[in-house]
Curated annotation (Swiss-Prot):
GO molecular function, one term: unfolded protein binding
Family: Belongs to the GrpE family.
Keyword Kinase tagged: no
GO annotations of cellular component type: cytoplasm
PANTHER family assigned: GRPE PROTEIN, GRPE PROTEIN HOMOLOG, MITOCHONDRIAL
Keywords: Chaperone, Cytoplasm, Stress response
Name of one Pfam family that matches: GrpE
Annotated organism of origin: Rickettsia akari (strain Hartford)
Name the record gives this protein: Protein GrpE
GO BP, sorted A to Z: protein folding; protein import into mitochondrial matrix
Gene name tied to this protein: grpE
CDD domains in the record: GrpE
Cited function: Participates actively in the response to hyperosmotic and heat shock by preventing the aggregation of stress-denatured proteins, in association with DnaK and GrpE. It is the nucleotide exchange factor for DnaK and may function as a thermosensor. Unfolded proteins bind initially to DnaJ; upon interaction with the DnaJ-bound protein, DnaK hydrolyzes its bound ATP, resulting in the formation of a stable complex. GrpE releases ADP from DnaK; ATP binding to DnaK triggers the release of the substrate protein, thus completing the reaction cycle.
Amino acid sequence: MIDDNIENNEQTINDIAEEIVEKANPEITELKAEIEELKDRLIRTTAEIDNTRKRLEKARDEAKDYAIATFAKELLNVSDNLSRALAHKPANSDIEVTNIIAGVQMTKDELDKIFHRHHIEEIKPEIGSMFDYNLHNAISQIEHPDHEPNSIITLMQSGYKIRDRLLRPATVQVAKKS
């Protein structure tokens, strides 16, 4: 009789255990699915955070590089005027004029150094080079037998860019078919 009780108790324990496992299996499956979903969300969120960080770093770098663009555009005319003044210096002049010209040259050189330090580059196309609408602004087309069509025949004003961004296109005249 004790053996029967033990067997009945064992059977009852086994039945209860099976019942618990049967009830727990869907919960375990559900919890495993939830864990997988959470892992997937974590991976996606981590990737999104990483992409956002990269975008912000790029935006910060661009802002730093191009923050001076508006100010630099205004200085371009100063550089042009200094170049024009130096291009028209008199051949024979007294000491005062020579000193003024030297001062203008030093100012132009210092401005060029500042431009270089801030990655501002002059666009000065060669005569005869081909017109590039990304860098040049054609103000006129002139028939010219010595030049290919769309080649630059006159540089009217230098252009400038800061890194890869155009500040001002070079103003040119281009040849057209005759």
